[in-house]
C-alpha cells in the first residue's frame, strides 16, 4: 500500500486543459463583458501609447476580449490580428471596428 501511494505521488498531475478552457470560456461569456470592457477602454489606448505603436506595425492582440487594445492599435493604422477564445467577444470587437471604419483581422 505504501509503495503504491509513493509510486502514485511521483507521477506528475496532468491538468485537463480542455475542460479548463471550456470553464473559462463559459465564465467570460456568461455576463455582460461589455460593461467591464468599456471601463477598460482607456487601458487599450494607454497601452498603445506606452508601447509607441506606429502606423504599419503588425500587432497581435491575444485575449482581445471586445477589442479595446485591438481598436486602439487599428486607430493608429496598424495591421492588427485579434484573437480570443470567446467568439462572442471577438464579434463585438469586429462590430466596433466596423462602426469606426477600422480594419482588423
Residue ranges and their predicted role:
Residues 6, 11-54, 68:
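Conserved class I S-adenosyl-L-methionine
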Amino acid at each position: 500500500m505504501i509503495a503504491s501511494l509513493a509510486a502514485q505521488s511521483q507521477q506528475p498531475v496532468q491538468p485537463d486543459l480542455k475542460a479548463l478552457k471550456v470553464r473559462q470560456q463559459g465564465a467570460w461569456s456568461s455576463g455582460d463583458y461589455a460593461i467591464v470592457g468599456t471601463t477598460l477602454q482607456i487601458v487599450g489606448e494607454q497601452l498603445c501609447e506606452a508601447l509607441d505603436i506606429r502606423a504599419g506595425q503588425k500587432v497581435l492582440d491575444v485575449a482581445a476580449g471586445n477589442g479595446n487594445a485591438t481598436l486602439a492599435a487599428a486607430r493608429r493604422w496598424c495591421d492588427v490580428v485579434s484573437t480570443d477564445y470567446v467568439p462572442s467577444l471577438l464579434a463585438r470587437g469586429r462590430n466596433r471596428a466596423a462602426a469606426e471604419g477600422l480594419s482588423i483581422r
